[in-house]
Amino acid sequence: MIEIVHSLPTPHDAVRAAADGAGRLIPPLWPLASSVAVNPFLGHTGEPLWAAGARLGRASGAAVTMPRSWYRDRIAAGSITDEDLLDALADAPADLRPADLGALRGAAALDPEPVRPLPTVASLCAEASGIDWPGLIADRLGAWAAGHFDEGQALWAAPSGGSTLALWRAWAIHDLTPEIAGLGGFARHVSEVPDGALPALARAVCGLGLSPGALESYFHQILLSLGGWAQYARYKLWQAELAGGTDGTLRDLLAVRVIWDEALLTRYGERIAESWAAVAAAHASPARPTRDLVIDSILQDAAERAAQRALAATLAATLAGGSPGVGESRPALQAAFCIDVRSEVFRRALESLDPGIRTLGFAGFFGLATAHRRFASDIAERRLPVLLNPGLRTCAGGPALSDADHASRLAARARRAWGRFRQAAVSSFAFVEAAGPLYAAKLLGDSLHLGGPATPHDPMPRLDPPRDLASRVATADAVLRAMSLTSTFAPIVLLVGHGANVVNNPHASALHCGACGGYSGEVNARLLAQLLNDADVRAGLRERGLEVPADTVFLAGLHDTTTDEVTLYAGDLPGGSPLQGLEPVRVWLAQAGKLARAERALRLPRARDNASVVRRSRDWAETRPEWGLAGCNAFIAAPRHRTAGQPLHGRAFLHDYDWQRDEGFGVLELIVTAPVVVASWISLQYYGSTVAPELFGSGNKLLHNVVGGIGVLEGNGGPLRAGLPRQSVHDGEHHAHEPLRLSVLIEAPRQAITDVLERHREVRALFDNRWLHLFALDQDGRMAWRYAGDLRWTSTAASDGAVPGLPLRAAV
């Protein structure tokens, strides 16, 4: 029997504050059906990299930068120069940085001691007993959580109808594994836990002898040890708060794990008392950055400055080449793509085919934040940035397709019933014997890459319920102005969303559009095309001073980023008659796809030619069908002619923006607070999965097992893994992603940018604490000003000391 020795009770308010504070340090994990890139440092953006490194190192032992050898190689190769090192050194905290360049170079030549996390109660008990308590806890919690959080994968649903803590207690009192392993009386201990997470946590931390000052650090370490389970609970809280509510799952899950420590300390307390007292005292002290952490952060900053120099040279080459600005002549074709870095390669290829082709970059949800129901489905897919709530409700099809809708629903039910029959406990054995040979053809086809999913072609989406004309006109006006597309319209304007068609890939949705919430972007593109082709909407736009020529047609498309093929939704056009001039557009798109595939093949392992790139999307054994957004390191908001024709190698998010058309700088504010933040999440997810793969990566794709439709395990057990697989950032020999924090370049008056930062403290924190770098471009498109933090700017060398740059303030 376990007896609890209570110390002085800890007030519930202190426990609540510490639990909530620790929970905010955990990034959310979206389920696999709509997985989006998440900044793993989301809770640390209020502190610089070295401070986050101190906190994470103490809790998990994770690094926040690359090994020193990675920087040494770049210094030796000359890509990181002495100037980069000196500039980074000058920006580091004076009390911990090396004295001069020589001292920094000397420090870079030495490898620091590995970061060791504080021991946990479970790890101390494992040392004392020889029993792998951390592994056993992860196994038992995972076994329960897989059923509790299941989103439809399991054949039998776990019990529901209570809090997460209550449901775990009901399960745990019948689980004899801990007692068999040596934790006698565990079931009784669980049965005596107070109802509610706060009372349970308060009792447990008293038993653990933790002071109020130690709680947040201890809770943070516990939540990190839960891996993706804690992150999924954080997602539930995120979604609840976005809807104006709250959710207690994360706090309950924390209580579940702390109850284990409470029981273990009671069982092994005498043997680990001294060690645990030292750990508890360490949790109560601040996590202070070490000199090595600051040195590593300086080296990281220097690597980023080297990349910024290269980018500045690329932009200067555009200027030196005399690249013309956008003229007044009418283009033959305009094509708006998502700002996704994969679009940059295709856009450059398309523009190279004809001087009359112009492309634009805009967030891939095209300004339409919609909750969409696909054909014959009642599931509302949130096709919008996860920072936002849907403002529209849409569906595919309409009353005229009710018979087809009914037939599709019946077919879907039959498929689900057949699938459950195949997987059921009893029938699965007979199924393999009786029906297994019927799958020989499918097995052969999949092995020969003959099958695979097709691009979805749902019926044309529509607003449900419809919006009044004034609302539709206002939406169309806002979107066109945000795209800086207000004049010189081409006869055909493509609105191209993007998605990826791959097979046998649990993380397939991560290759879709991040701005569309992890879904492909054709729905939003088709909706906007309908809106802009509406004659009544165009008349309303005319009254607002925005004239769209009568012969201009907006046509939606979908860019498959795996094959670089573009599907056009010409069937959505009003009237049903063939569109004049469409055939040359199809030819251009096919040629651009061929050029883009040839460029991408140079980076893809074993990609020999165009055909092999396409074949990868149907290969069920291919762990790298495409590189996704690996390599991303810049975000540029400027007119397209600043970057046109320059090889950015699929590393830059490109958002069209003309500040002189942005009266009041509302579009600038939208860009800085939405697309820039989404891009930062993507960039920092790739960064975290590269520098700290054990903490922020999902491991080896070859070992993945999908759990509950939520995430993956690496192997047959252990914690839920979040983040990117190793194959998404590494080619087997070298890193495919260079972990650099994003450099944001904006062509706008500095004061306008400063005003936006001043109004949005959370966004400003990203730049003040160097999770993002910020530059203002001058009137020639050069990187003339660097944001120095605290709403200050410093001149850079990019303008050779002679160019005054854009005005501090816009002319009135």
Curated annotation (Swiss-Prot):
Name a GO molecular-function annotation: zinc ion binding
Transmembrane regions listed in the UniProt entry:
none
Residues that bind Zn(2+): C338, D340, H498, C513
Domain of life the protein comes from:
Bacteria
Q: How does it sit in the membrane?
A: Peripheral membrane protein
> Where is it mostly found?
membrane
Swiss-Prot/TrEMBL cofactor(s): Zn(2+)
Query: Which GO cellular component does the record give, naming just one?
Result: plasma membrane
Report the locations given in the UniProt record.
Cell inner membrane
Write the record's keywords in alphabetical order, separated by commas.
Answer: Cell inner membrane, Cell membrane, Membrane, Metal-binding, Transport, Zinc
Matching InterPro entries = DabA
Pfam families noted in UniProt: DabA
Known role:
Part of an energy-coupled inorganic carbon pump.
Family matches, as HAMAP family: DabA (MF_01871)
Give the similarity note: Belongs to the inorganic carbon transporter (TC 9.A.2) DabA family.
Q: How does it assemble?
A: Forms a complex with DabB.
Q: What is this protein called?
A: Probable inorganic carbon transporter subunit DabA
